[in-house]
Amino acid sequence: MEAQSSSRQVTGPLYLGVKEDWEEQHDVKAEAFLQAGEGRKEKGAQGQPGVGAVGKEGEGEELSGGEGQFGPGAPGPMGDEDKDGGTRAGGVEEEQNEPAAEGTESQKNGKPEDRQMPLQGSRFAQQRLSELQSILQRTNSFDVPREDLYRLMDTCVARVQNWFKIRRAAARRNRRRTTPVPEHFRGTFECPACRGVRWGERCPFATPRF
């Protein structure tokens, strides 16, 4: 028992010493790794010396309204391209406006002959009617051959026939309006004699007017 306790007392300090040595080595490695990382960061920052200046200048440009070396009035290829583009766009707009102005001038100075004339359908019908009336007045009869009317009026026979039909219907309508109506015909429509009575004749069954 005494031998075992003595061996434990001997191995205990040895184990503690080994553990302390391992912890010290681990701390040394960690410090070396951190120092190496910081050195890399410093080298990267030294390799880009204008980064901070550019960042400050960019912030100043944003605060001043965005006008800097790359603005619209800056000297260089960008400013020249803007000028060229502006002149080109202005030339295209002028070319587009010139044909429109020419078109308006031509419309203003256009001849009246070029404009579309209104239709003369009513005048044409009135002219044909006057010709037909003059023909009927000279002959004083409705028995004029339709072929002569067709030849004189320069129209087809069907139109002449249709015109005569319309004129007859109009004459009958006017005659009915001017002729008197039987007295009792206004009161009743059941008189058997009035059904066969002509316009203008008096019905034999008509009652005397008081």
From Swiss-Prot:
Annotated compartments: Nucleus
Single Gene Ontology MF annotation: DNA binding
One cellular component term from this protein's GO annotations in UniProt: nucleus
Binding region for DNA: 117-175
Region (Disordered): 29-117
Gene3D superfamilies assigned to the protein according to its UniProt record, in alphabetical order: Homeodomain-like (1.10.10.60)
Keyword Nucleus: yes
GO BP, sorted A to Z: cell differentiation
The protein's name in its UniProt record: Homeobox protein Rhox5
Gene: Rhox5
